[in-house]
């Protein structure tokens, strides 16, 4: 059986889809998946053993120059790659009109998705041949597991979902695995940042622990923040620029992780590493860290400036 997954973004949403593949793999021996995903997250599906082909899409980039000759050529190549296979099922786990119209609609196969009442954008359900009612008041991982089970005809396991990607990194862990912590200090929204003085206070509290601290970053302003956090602490290392797979490998070897609400926090959960995630204005209830040893630290009054380092430690 060959199935196409449409789950293009974001990082957390893509990661939250992985346990559903593990369920399907256990229920249907030999099942294989192709996966349409935004180019920036294209490494993630390849870490799961059930994924045979990753089809990158670049809707975010294309829409900036949709009708330019280079973008039209890329869109044509994507459509040809998408339509090269006739699928036993196409599962749209995104639930958005944009991805349903630009991706799911074009694929060959019976199209499954959430119904009008439960899709993230109800209009997206108009593009599906089979519409499934998936209750909203459950974690995003469980919603996707239920969607896959109903689409492919098996009972959703009652056990906790298994991302099944940690083993991808076990054969090539960093040489100092288990001897360091990773602090994920960067996120996209200003109100989700934990103040730098609190990060530095937490770093200071670990001075006598014997644990080194590694600080990854993605954008130049994040590198500057990492350098400010590390200043004066010999046991703190600002990492070089890394690919997503490189960051994942560092996370896989961490003794523990402390993070703000960010996609890499979900990656930490997917890698089964102990993680404390600090939350301010966002509610972790239905979209927070899912997995083993995932701890939530809520800020008083949902204001991260009020969350002290001692409360996190």
Predicted regions and their residues:
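Catalytic machinery of carbohydrate-active enzymes
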Residues: 1-313
């Amino acid at each position: 059986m060959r199935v196409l997954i449409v789950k293009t973004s974001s990082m957390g949403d893509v990661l939250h889809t992985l346990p559903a593949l593990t369920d399907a793999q256990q229920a249907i021996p030999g099942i294989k998946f192709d996966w349409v995903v935004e180019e920036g997250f294209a490494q993630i599906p390849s870490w799961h053993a059930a994924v045979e082909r990753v089809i990158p899409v670049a809707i975010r980039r294309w829409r900036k120059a949709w009708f330019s000759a280079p973008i039209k050529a890329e869109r044509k190549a994507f459509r040809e790659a998408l339509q090269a296979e006739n699928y036993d099922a196409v599962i749209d786990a995104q639930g958005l009109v944009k991805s349903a119209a630009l991706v799911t609609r074009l694929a060959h196969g019976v199209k499954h998705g959430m119904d009008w009442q439960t899709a993230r954008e109800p209009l997206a359900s108009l593009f599906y041949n089979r519409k499934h009612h998936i209750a909203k008041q459950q974690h995003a991982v469980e919603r996707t597991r239920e969607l896959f089970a109903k689409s492919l005809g098996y009972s959703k396991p009652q056990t906790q979902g298994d991302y099944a990607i940690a083993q991808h990194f076990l054969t090539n862990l960093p040489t100092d695995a288990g001897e360091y912590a990773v602090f994920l200090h960067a996120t996209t929204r200003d109100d989700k940042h934990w103040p730098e003085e609190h990060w530095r206070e937490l770093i200071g509290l670990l001075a006598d622990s014997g644990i080194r601290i590694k600080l990854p970053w993605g954008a130049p302003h994040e590198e500057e923040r990492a350098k400010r956090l590390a200043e004066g602490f010999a046991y703190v290392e600002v990492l070089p620029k890394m690919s997503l797979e490189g960051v994942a490998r560092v996370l896989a070897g961490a003794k523990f992780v402390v993070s703000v609400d960010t996609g890499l926090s979900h990656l930490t959960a997917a890698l089964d590493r102990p993680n404390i995630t600090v939350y301010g204005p966002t509610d972790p209830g239905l979209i927070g860290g899912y997995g083993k040893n995932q701890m939530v630290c809520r800020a008083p009054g949902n204001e991260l400036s009020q969350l002290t380092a001692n409360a996190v430690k």
